[in-house]
Amino acid sequence: MEAPPVTMMPVTGGTINMMEYLLQGSVLDHSLESLIHRLRGLCDNMEPETFLDHEMVFLLKGQQASPFVLRARRSMDRAGAPWHLRYLGQPEMGDKNRHALVRNCVDIATSENLTDFLMEMGFRMDHEFVAKGHLFRKGIMKVVVYKIFRILVPGNTDSTEALSLSYLVELSVVAPAGQDMVSDDMRNFAEQLKPLVHLEKIDPKRLM
């Protein structure tokens, strides 16, 4: 969807290690409009963006116990928009004083032959889905509210059905490593969304 924001830190002999700080929750369909109204009041004074994306998750199995995972995403409603390749590292859950999940994040725009390239590299597609929703911004924070649709016929994004009767809500910041104070701002913002949605530091391993 989005490339990491540009930082003002000088790059000296290498790339900046970017981290994603994340809080997650969900709302039932009937609460969506109330949440959208609240976010319009709390977020930056600009019209929220809408998105309709097709995401494919690729795995590469090797010597390690768990496969290497890459995510390829393209916009379905913006002609000519580049594909995006995303890598998300293992979450750092240990620090109880940190109010958000933290994981390494690499997000780059690519050419449209991305999926062919991944297959040539030995990756295989594990699953795919369509995500449709709204994107809000509050300073460097990003809030996405979206519904996931399963693809009924592999590769056919016109044949989908909703995965659940709820919308996922994600509050995130992409920043250089060591900027843990952003999790305090995220927690304060999340408090303002209660009781409509409870955004939490969720360990993905608990969902498996």
Curated annotation (Swiss-Prot):
PANTHER family: MEDIATOR OF RNA POLYMERASE II TRANSCRIPTION SUBUNIT 18 (PTHR13321:SF2), MEDIATOR OF RNA POLYMERASE II TRANSCRIPTION, SUBUNIT 18 (PTHR13321). The modification Phosphoserine is found at S66. GO terms for biological process: positive regulation of transcription elongation by RNA polymerase II; positive regulation of transcription initiation by RNA polymerase II; RNA polymerase II preinitiation complex assembly. Belongs to the Mediator complex subunit 18 family. Keywords: Activator, Nucleus, Phosphoprotein, Transcription, Transcription regulation. Its main location: nucleus. This is Mediator of RNA polymerase II transcription subunit 18. It holds the Pfam family Med18. One of its GO terms (cellular component) is nucleus. Component of the Mediator complex, a coactivator involved in the regulated transcription of nearly all RNA polymerase II-dependent genes. Mediator functions as a bridge to convey information from gene-specific regulatory proteins to the basal RNA polymerase II transcription machinery. Mediator is recruited to promoters by direct interactions with regulatory proteins and serves as a scaffold for the assembly of a functional preinitiation complex with RNA polymerase II and the general transcription factors. Component of the Mediator complex, which is composed of MED1, MED4, MED6, MED7, MED8, MED9, MED10, MED11, MED12, MED13, MED13L, MED14, MED15, MED16, MED17, MED18, MED19, MED20, MED21, MED22, MED23, MED24, MED25, MED26, MED27, MED29, MED30, MED31, CCNC, CDK8 and CDC2L6/CDK11. The MED12, MED13, CCNC and CDK8 subunits form a distinct module termed the CDK8 module. Mediator containing the CDK8 module is less active than Mediator lacking this module in supporting transcriptional activation. InterPro entries: Mediator_Med18 (IPR019095). It is found in: Nucleus. The keyword Ribosomal protein does not apply. The keyword Membrane does not apply. One of its GO terms (molecular function) is transcription coregulator activity.
